Amino acid sequence: MMLLLPFLLGLLGPGSYLFISGDCQEVATVMVKFQVTEEVPSGTVIGKLSQELRVEERRGKAGDAFQILQLPQALPVQMNSEDGLLSTSSRLDREKLCRQEDPCLVSFDVLATGASALIHVEIQVLDINDHQPQFPKDEQELEISESASLHTRIPLDRALDQDTGPNSLYSYSLSPSEHFALDVIVGPDETKHAELVVVKELDRELHSYFDLVLTAYDNGNPPKSGISVVKVNVLDSNDNSPVFAESSLALEIPEDTVPGTLLINLTATDPDQGPNGEVEFFFGKHVSPEVMNTFGIDAKTGQIILRQALDYEKNPAYEVDVQARDLGPNSIPGHCKVLIKVLDVNDNAPSILITWASQTSLVSEDLPRDSFIALVSANDLDSGNNGLVHCWLNQELGHFRLKRTNGNTYMLLTNATLDREQWPIYTLTVFAQDQGPQPLSAEKELQIQVSDVNDNAPVFEKSRYEVSTWENNPPSLHLITLKAHDADLGSNGKVSYRIKDSPVSHLVIIDFETGEVTAQRSLDYEQMAGFEFQVIAEDRGQPQLASSISVWVSLLDANDNAPEVIQPVLSEGKATLSVLVNASTGHLLLPIENPSGMDPAGTGIPPKATHSPWSFLLLTIVARDADSGANGELFYSIQSGNDAHLFFLSPSLGQLFINVTNASSLIGSQWDLGIVVEDQGSPSLQTQVSLKVVFVTSVDHLRDSAHEPGVLSTPALALICLAVLLAIFGLLLALFVSICRTERKDNRAYNCREAESSYRHQPKRPQKHIQKADIHLVPVLRAHENETDEVRPSHKDTSKETLMEAGWDSCLQAPFHLTPTLYRTLRNQGNQGELAESQEVLQDTFNFLFNHPRQRNASRENLNLPESPPAVRQPLLRPLKVPGSPIARATGDQDKEEAPQSPPASSATLRRQRNFNGKVSPRGESGPHQILRSLVRLSVAAFAERNPVEEPAGDSPPVQQISQLLSLLHQGQFQPKPNHRGNKYLAKPGGSSRGTIPDTEGLVGLKPSGQAEPDLEEGPPSPEEDLSVKRLLEEELSSLLDPNTGLALDKLSPPDPAWMARLSLPLTTNYRDNLSSPDATTSEEPRTFQTFGKTVGPGPELSPTGTRLASTFVSEMSSLLEMLLGQHTVPVEAASAALRRLSVCGRTLSLDLATSGASASEAQGRKKAAESRLGCGRNL
């Protein structure tokens, strides 16, 4: 109910309010107010209670959602019990319902069963201006003497208006007159009446009468009025008229005043003498008949007496007009208004009205506390304290209480839970008493019947049942009958029985109606000595209630089990016991079955002292009997085979002894003993055992046991299993470690700057501090087609002979600077030891450097290096052609006709295979010839790094192309693009198409990092493209070193930026192997890279001074082009400075050539001095 409180507070309309007592938790008292205007037609809707409370309408359901508990008889209102719709049943007349009461409120109570609330409905009937003011008579006649003085007042009849508020009587008005005026007087009770006032002297001779119109009007919209004609007759002069001591009086009398009681004595005086001074009293002409019947006046004395009983409830006030006149002629009466108020007295006893919530006095016993039972209304017709009623209950148990809701209305609530089984009928007495000085009371007796609910579970007669029975009972044996009682009525009190499911519930069964328990099967004491099950008793009410009880069944043991021998172990009722005998002494040893030296019975006592000093314990027979008590007590005896009384068997313990001190004579003999084990039951059961006792010596025993197969013990088996598991675990661990330590080789091109930066930010690797001054990134010379390993030996001999014939063999012996690429080439070509050991190796290295094919990056493939260097291949050297030239078109057409050939799958390098159908270089061509062509190719690669301002002529010889490159550098028109990719050279994306420059097919196109390398078709060079090395050296050497060499700019063709030299050998995963110290000097000692300390082997021997020109030229040109391809972007001024250094280096070369007759050390010293001053060599 506490949950209903906020619901009701939030759902009531603005005209409603809720109050609820703190001790009432089941029924809320709600007050709902409605307003309706009077005179509405029948059937007009006043309000809907379901909308006010927002409860669901119970259409089509049993019972009513709303019920009127008390309705005034005069109120024409009806209610729909389903949704609480209030409407008028007939015409509403506020004046009839409330008379002059304002506001007009009528109330009644409604019980909302859906919301568990008592609704106090209060309907305010609003007044409309449906009545006009009315005078008692339409015409009133007055008499006045012509000698009346000014300001004489004559009371006029008061008009009545049944409406209230603004619609009631508002004021009066008088038609215009020069002799009379109107004065409106407001009485103590807010009533208004008019008085006629003389404002001008009267003259009967001029005006004998006056006709005036008195109008009374209200303040309604529109206002209504009523008129009365006042006729004033002017009489001859009578000097004086009677005058009352007070013109108006108010009198209060109790309503219980006895008729005939004098209420007031009025007095009036007239100063005249004789008849003109005698005064008589009478009621005015316009006094109502009700007043005339209720009151009377004595004409002589002026006493007003009560003629009949008063009733405050009918008329609480009376207004009386009393007049007094003398007995003279033309008498003028005097007027006096007397207001008589009736005082209410406690003359009405309270009346008690009971309205049941369920239309009957039958209540359910499962009602919770503070449940609503009935509405008690105490009515008292008296007013004030006389009408205030207090009610209370007179009861024995205190299960009910009354709670005031509003006024004299109470709710009858439950004060405790009800119990039909103890009190099926409750008798209550309701007392009501008002609050008057002499209180009046009333009483009413109530009888409340309690209906039964299923609130009692069945109860067994005992809290636990126990029963005993013999085992091996027949099925359907009666065990016990259970009985449970239920105090409820009808089906709520009918009890049924069942057994709760359990492991033993299948052993018994119970009758559903009677509760008789029987056994379903034969019971066995040896399986269970007793069992317990639960019986559930349930009634048939809703909801169903149940109770349970435990029943213990004890089984009595019967001797139904024979003894069972456990030791010795029997085989078909037989057992064998071997006893060891010392053949020399005849002493008995332990039985074979008991090698531990302890008592066979397990007592821990040595066998010697068990029975007697001369006896020996052979065996303890262990038997058991599943029966209990005497049925399980066992007796042991030897039945047969002991005729010589050699053995003794303990009857109670089952210990078998032998009575002998020297058993030498028993060796080899055997005894068959018949042993009987018998219980003490009735009848007794027994078991027979055949025991064979054999006496043997220790030698015989050992001989027999040698033939028995060996059996591994449990600890040995455990150790073997543990060893196997550890071995398996070790193998798995070794396999796991070997897999985890497998290195993933990444032989991609290395960038020292990026590697150093990324290496520092890897927290799982140690920091490798690399000094930038100690390392220098050099370009790698690359070759072309794949060569097989099988042609390598023939190439060695051929290249050497060709080199000697051309006069260049001395060049290979000259000391020159090895680039890291050349050094790795020498190191990786088959474990060669010394450079001076074989000049052919160096020559083969150069050939391999420029002719080795480029393959796919093997960082994610299996890297299988060739066991021997591939065969020599003539490097591809093609002059640049102008786009559209005949040579370019012929070559392009030839390339289109040739189909590419796939390289051998067995070749493994860091670059992927290229499809190239090239020709093998002629044997007559020397190594320097190939080196020069490679340098030309590197120069064109440098042009591919930019959009050239000036382009070298495509038909110029190779050395002239290098000269043109240097001239562009000198003029500041070429700035090499910086390279940050180590041994890879970036090129401008979007190279020329094959149709434009077809002679660049033999070179590798560059690609951005992370992109796939495009496959380019490669074609063989044309014969006319081969150049003579001698002609190159004779005609163009001077122009190579001359900074003022002119360029044929008009013949330049755009280079193809999509190619560069191929990598000659695969790179290693160790970045140290891809770097070199550029400042390392040549020495005859074994050479070592200063940065990483890797020993290569002995260097080449110094060549004669006359042959150093070609070696120096190759070294300086290699250093120059390394700088061009690997340096960062420099301004034009830096390029000019580099060219000036190159000129000095050229003069250094000339100096070396001029001083060929000097010693090698002197020439080398002068050269290094010049280089150190201007930064020649690798510092260029």
Swiss-Prot record:
Residues 1014-1026 have a biased composition (Acidic residues). Residues 28-135, 136-244, 245-352, 355-460, 461-565, 600-711 form the Cadherin domain. Disruption phenotype: Mice are viable and fertile. Mice however show alterations in placental development that result in embryonic growth retardation: placentas are smaller and show limited angiogenesis and mis-segregation of the labyrinthine and intermediate layers. Mice also display modifications in the structure and function of arteries, such as rearrangement of the arterial wall elastic fibers. Keywords: Calcium, Cell adhesion, Cell junction, Cell membrane, Glycoprotein, Membrane, Phosphoprotein, Repeat, Secreted, Signal, Transmembrane, Transmembrane helix. InterPro entries: Cadherin-like_dom, Cadherin-like_sf, Cadherin_CS, Cadherin_N, Protocadherin/Cadherin-CA. GO terms for biological process: calcium-dependent cell-cell adhesion via plasma membrane cell adhesion molecules; glycogen metabolic process; homophilic cell adhesion via plasma membrane adhesion molecules; labyrinthine layer development. Expressed in endothelial cells: localizes in vasculogenic rather than angiogenic endothelium. Strongly expressed in a subset of invasive cells of the placenta, named glycogen-rich trophoblasts cells (at protein level). glycogen-rich trophoblasts cells originate from the from the ectoplacental cone where they rapidly form tight islets (at protein level). In adult mice, present at high level in mesangial cells of kidney glomeruli, while expression was not detected in other types of perivascular cells. Residues 857-930, 973-1026, 1076-1104, 1156-1180 are annotated as: Disordered. Residues 904-918, 1076-1093 have a biased composition (Polar residues). The modification Phosphoserine is found at S859, S1064. N-glycosylated. The chain crosses the membrane at residues 717-737. Glycans are attached at N265, N415, N582, N659, N662. SMART domains: CA. Residues 1-17 form the signal peptide. The keyword Aminoacyl-tRNA synthetase does not apply. One of its GO terms (molecular function) is calcium ion binding. GO terms for cellular component: cell-cell junction; extracellular region; plasma membrane. Residues 18-716 are extracellular. Residues 738-1180 are cytoplasmic. Cellular adhesion molecule that may play an important role in cell-cell interactions at interendothelial junctions. Acts as a regulator of cell migration, probably via increasing cell-cell adhesion. Promotes homotypic calcium-dependent aggregation and adhesion and clusters at intercellular junctions. Unable to bind to catenins, weakly associates with the cytoskeleton. This is Protocadherin-12. It comes from Mus musculus (Mouse). The lineage of its organism: Eukaryota, Metazoa, Chordata, Craniata, Vertebrata. The gene is Pcdh12.
